[in-house]
Amino acid sequence: MSDVELDHEYWMRHALTLAKRAWDEREVPVGAVLVHNHRVIGEGWNRPIGRHDPTAHAEIMALRQGGLVLQNYRLLDTTLYVTLEPCVMCAGAMVHSRIGRVVFGARDAKTGAAGSLIDVLHHPGMNHRVEIIEGVLRDECATLLSDFFRMRRQEIKALKKADRAEGAGPAV
């Protein structure tokens, strides 16, 4: 494995740690780390439910911090590591902020905007192209998400079962 690949894995592991914070807050476990010159300048994890903010995705949180650190809305020569393929909103923010590269773990067939559903980052109508590297720690990223949604389905099933048992009343 090359030094560059090891570097990508290092930062993706950091993003996975942040994704676990989202899980702990009962948010969809996605984490993001924005790196400039081998230094973290922004990080985030999904928080739209807790913050009552539909834009509080991990990527947006990391980009906002990066802008404050660099004191610039242009995040030139930065790399954003994120555990899940970005959505249209996040991909659009990446284009507007002029990041150099996004590295993501798991693809998102339903809402992925880096090639799965649509490719905002390479769209010919955009005035900036973002380099895409995908599949870094893919299995770990995908497993975290599938485990989270499995747990949520089991919780919902248990609640429905409890509601049915509660509503049944005594046998006559």
Swiss-Prot record:
Catalytic residues (UniProt): E59
GO biological process assignments: tRNA wobble adenosine to inosine editing
PROSITE patterns: CYT_DCMP_DEAMINASES_1, CYT_DCMP_DEAMINASES_2
Recorded catalytic activity of this chain's protein: adenosine(34) in tRNA + H2O + H(+) = inosine(34) in tRNA + NH4(+)
Assigned EC number: 3.5.4.33
Cofactor notes: Binds 1 zinc ion per subunit.
Span of domain CMP/dCMP-type deaminase: 6-117
Molecular function as annotated in GO: tRNA-specific adenosine-34 deaminase activity; zinc ion binding
SS bond partners: none
CDD domains assigned to the protein according to its UniProt record, in alphabetical order: nucleoside_deaminase
Record's keyword terms, sorted: Hydrolase, Metal-binding, tRNA processing, Zinc
Gene3D superfamilies to which the protein is assigned, alphabetical: Cytidine Deaminase, domain 2
NCBIfam families documented for this protein: PRK10860.1
Family statement drawn from the similarity comment of this UniProt entry: Belongs to the cytidine and deoxycytidylate deaminase family.
The name this protein goes by in its record: tRNA-specific adenosine deaminase
Organism (species): Salmonella typhimurium (strain LT2 / SGSC1412 / ATCC 700720)
